[in-house]
Amino acid sequence: KGIQAVDDARLAADAGVEAVALSNHGGRQLDGAPAPLGLVAPVADAVGDRVEIICDGGVRRGSDIVKAVALGARAAMAGRAYLYGLGAAGERGVDHVLGLLDTDVRRTMALVGARTVADLSPALVSGPDP
């Protein structure tokens, strides 16, 4: 479904792709697959200067989006979150969920002291080096 290892991200970058999606199957098919959010930093370190990184999976709230971007992702996909809104209230539910995500992204950025997306960095979400 998507990249699940740094070596695969390197292969994709070497092949000339413009972006990689870090993804798994949500624990449904293989419960031992790495979480996409946990792959963002190592993949960004390895190939972030050559490809855009998209974090696909595990996004439940705006703070997850902030973490993904701070760690090196260009974008984060939140498929399940909007489906809950769709199932509960149709189009209005999707709008509501997107509003909640937007509010949480803005709140989280304020709490970590990031005024813009460009201000996000790994140090804001991963703590100091030991």
Segments (PLM) and residue ranges:
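C-terminal extensions of enzymes
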Residues: 82-83, 89-130
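Alpha/beta enzyme core
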Residues: 1-55, 62-84
